[in-house]
């Protein structure tokens, strides 16, 4: 009878990425893999798109808010229903363990697993825990963290960033699409890549649209999240979404302009890619991106520019400063000890699962 593991996590791509790195390794080792999430969430889309042999189980989900809203009343019932559904799924599957990457949808499965005596392993990518993981931590066997947590928590293992990137550009798959893009770019101009993420692309899209003169100063690659903006013209490539092209585009760019999501930041760190961080503010997030950006700037990995300060003048100043000190930034990134390989984390997780099962 095959061993079973249940994954959960969703709401944004960042709450799915690590799961998609780990799942193939479990499948390769003969595990039966299941996933609990929202059928209308990005986790369902990403799992389907991956083509991996994973059984997806949909549950009801409600948003966890730190502020008063009448919607909280309705969401209490959704979360309760999600918990009942999770209990039923786990009781039926009887997995050896549950791994959660966080997000609102992950709380009911985590609680259900704990109630049924299953080991629970969770992961936190940001400088400080989000509300979902603050709740999940109470039910977890172990929490793995990308950043060292300021609070001394007994169940935390500081891991560093787990990222799957090609550090050598020669390892990346060739792309005829990328060659077509290069035909529209000038070798005399620096190439900038704007990555806004699922929650933050709009501001970058608008900034580029409002300042066509950027195309005279740089080659611009803009991952927009909006298919209506798709365009390939002189010094400009706008595309709504990329998968296989993602890392080749990063490698092609001289500098990346990004939000402050930890997954993207650590991918850029692993590739030692020069970058400017424009974090989402507290009006659009819980402030985690501000913390991540400040951490990266203090470590000497990057420079940050606050969204309200994103003017053409300030942007050009930031570009000039980054390119002037490019060698220093790259040397600091190359010397980092904060990156771990997927194989390292997989082996650690497998060992921790085995230990937890033996202790039951």
Curated annotation (Swiss-Prot):
Reactions performed catalytically: Mur2Ac(oyl-L-Ala-gamma-D-Glu-L-Lys-D-Ala-D-Ala)-di-trans,octa-cis-undecaprenyl diphosphate + UDP-N-acetyl-alpha-D-glucosamine = beta-D-GlcNAc-(1->4)-Mur2Ac(oyl-L-Ala-gamma-D-Glu-L-Lys-D-Ala-D-Ala)-di-trans,octa-cis-undecaprenyl diphosphate + UDP + H(+)
Binding-site positions, UDP-N-acetyl-alpha-D-glucosamine: 198, 289
GO biological processes: carbohydrate metabolic process; cell division; cell wall organization; lipid glycosylation; peptidoglycan biosynthetic process; regulation of cell shape
Top enzyme category: transferase
Domain of life from the UniProt record: Bacteria
Database matches in SUPFAM superfamilies: UDP-Glycosyltransferase/glycogen phosphorylase
Membrane topology: Peripheral membrane protein
EC number, UniProt record: 2.4.1.227
InterPro entries in UniProt: GlcNAc_MurG, Glyco_trans_28_C, GlycoTrans_28_N
Coiled-coil intervals: none
A Pfam family annotated for this UniProt entry: Glyco_transf_28
Keyword tRNA processing among UniProt keywords: no
A GO MF term: undecaprenyldiphospho-muramoylpentapeptide beta-N-acetylglucosaminyltransferase activity
Protein's pathway: Cell wall biogenesis; peptidoglycan biosynthesis
Record-level GO cellular component terms: plasma membrane
Keyword Kinase: no
Keyword terms, alphabetized: Cell cycle, Cell division, Cell membrane, Cell shape, Cell wall biogenesis/degradation, Glycosyltransferase, Membrane, Peptidoglycan synthesis, Transferase
General function of this protein: Cell wall formation. Catalyzes the transfer of a GlcNAc subunit on undecaprenyl-pyrophosphoryl-MurNAc-pentapeptide (lipid intermediate I) to form undecaprenyl-pyrophosphoryl-MurNAc-(pentapeptide)GlcNAc (lipid intermediate II).
Family per record: Belongs to the glycosyltransferase 28 family. MurG subfamily.
Protein name: UDP-N-acetylglucosamine--N-acetylmuramyl-(pentapeptide) pyrophosphoryl-undecaprenol N-acetylglucosamine transferase
Organism: Streptococcus pyogenes serotype M49 (strain NZ131)
């Amino acid at each position: 009878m095959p061993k079973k593991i249940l994954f959960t996590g969703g709401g944004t791509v960042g709450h799915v990425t690590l799961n998609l790195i780990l799942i193939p390794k479990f499948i390769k080792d003969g595990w039966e893999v299941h996933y609990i999430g929202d059928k209308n969430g990005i986790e369902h889309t990403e799992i389907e798109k991956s083509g991996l042999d994973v059984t997806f189980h949909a549950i009801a989900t409600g948003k966890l808010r730190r502020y008063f809203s009448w919607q909280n009343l309705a969401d209490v019932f959704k979360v309760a229903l999600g918990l009942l559904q999770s209990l039923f799924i786990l009781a039926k599957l009887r997995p050896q363990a549950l791994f959660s990457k966080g997000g609102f949808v992950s709380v009911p499965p985590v609680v259900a697993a704990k109630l049924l005596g299953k080991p629970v392993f969770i992961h936190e990518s940001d400088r400080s825990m989000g509300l979902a993981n603050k709740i999940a931590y109470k039910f977890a066997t172990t929490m793995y963290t990308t950043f060292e947590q300021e609070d001394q928590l007994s169940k935390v293992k500081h891991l560093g960033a787990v990222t799957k990137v090609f550090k050598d550009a020669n390892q990346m798959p060739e792309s005829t699409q990328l060659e077509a893009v290069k035909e529209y770019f000038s070798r005399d101009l620096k190439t900038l890549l704007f990555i806004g993420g699922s929650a933050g692309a709009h501001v970058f899209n608008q900034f580029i649209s409002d300042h066509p003169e950027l195309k005279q100063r740089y080659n611009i690659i803009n991952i927009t999240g909006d298919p209506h903006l798709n365009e390939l013209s002189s010094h400009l490539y706008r595309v709504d979404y990329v998968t296989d092209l993602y890392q080749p585009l990063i490698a092609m760019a001289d500098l990346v302009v990004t939000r402050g999501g930890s997954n993207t930041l650590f991918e850029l760190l692993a590739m030692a890619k020069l970058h400017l961080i424009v974090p989402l503010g507290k009006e659009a997030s819980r402030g985690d991106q501000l913390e991540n950006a400040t951490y990266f700037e203090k470590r000497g990995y990057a420079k940050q520019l606050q969204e309200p300060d994103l003017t053409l003048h300030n942007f050009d100043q930031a570009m000039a400063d980054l390119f002037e000190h490019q060698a220093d930034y790259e040397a600091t990134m190359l010397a980092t000890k904060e990156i771990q390989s997927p194989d390292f984390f997989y082996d650690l997780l497998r060992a921790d699962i085995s230990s937890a099962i033996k202790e039951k």
